[in-house]
Amino acid sequence: MKKTTAIAAVCLACLTAAGCSQNTQAPLSEQPEQTTTAASLSTEDTTIRFTDQAGNEIELDRPPERVIISSIFPIPSVFALFRGSGAEIVGMNPSAMEAAENSYLAKVYPEILNADTSFVQGGEINIESVAALEPDLVIYSAQNPEEKALYDSLGIPSAAFSPAGQGFDCVETYISWNELLGDIYGDNGTAADIAAKARAAAKKVTDITDTIPEEEKPSAVILFNCANGSIKAAGTGSFGDYWITAAGGVNAAAEVKGHADVSIEQLYTWDPDILLLSNFVPASPDQVIKGENDTDLTGLRAVQEGKVYKYPTGFYRWYPASSDAPLSLEWTALHIQPERFADFDFPADIKTWYTDVYGLTLSDEEVQALTD
């Protein structure tokens, strides 16, 4: 009988091992010398030990060469950038593949499009299909702990990556994912380089927004989704709350938790100065302003004043944590505090980031298309 498990929707965002295992720890006398890092790569063998972001202690016989990323959707793009290739990803969630097909990820690492997605059907993981891909490691969301039990049942090594471990700070979350990859692959130097670039870019924004008086911060709401008569707003404990507050605004939806279902009446009560749409909202800002989406938001002050903006897709979707997180923070700040960021040359910053981080040279037209 086939075994399946449900995947939580983002995010966000989300076999017999070929020589890899999660064995119990050896006696101290048999262990290799430990370092001060969370993971250690033995000088006598290739055994790797690390702690994932759910607190699980993992042991692998060697660095994984066949990886499935099941339920934390930004990770394929983060993984490919960290490793300099998407070839090791043999399986990924269909939602992550959809993002890859419509982003710069596939342009930089086209091999990622070869990853299998059939092990997820209707939001369910088929463990037999996972096993058939013979992964050395499965990466899953720490918010889906039931996945670990499924993989453990067949001895499949797995590691949890968390979207929430850094208080939903998108820049620090992205950095923490790279640090965990550094532990897995014994490459903390790459992780440190990524962290330095991301923090330096984000600091340009927060050096300004950290000094803004509360009375000069406009209110904003991010709609995580708005379709088929359902409205989900980003409350406290969400990426959306981080974007708004770090960019110099006040989250009008802070009274709700996470990505919460809210009524149209509640949204009209909040009546924010600015309305932001995540990548998961089907409608465009123009459709919202013209009342062409299936939920009429035209009575909102932000809509009437044309202050409706949608997160772009670059190397990945810009609403969740991603390798474009510093750019996403700048983009949000430009819309929440436009006067304070009037001197920022955002198109130039995009070009610089894409050259320095991805090795891409974008034209003016490509930059315009990315942010439209």
What is each of the regions a protein language model found here?
Residues 1-10:
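Positively charged n-region of N-terminal signal peptides that target proteins for export
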Residues 9-17:
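Bacterial N-terminal signal peptides
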Residues 18-30:
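Bacterial lipoprotein signal-peptidase II cleavage site
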Residues 30-52, 56-61:
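N-terminal low-complexity, Pro/Thr/Ser-rich intrinsically disordered segments
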Residues 53-55, 113-127, 256-264:
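Short helix-initiation/N-cap motifs at beta->coil->alpha
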Residues 70-132, 137:
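A short, structured surface patch at a secondary-structure boundary
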Residues 147-229, 253-254, 309-371:
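Extracytoplasmic substrate-binding proteins
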Residues 232-259:
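Alpha-helical, coiled-coil/dimerization segments enriched in small aliphatic residues
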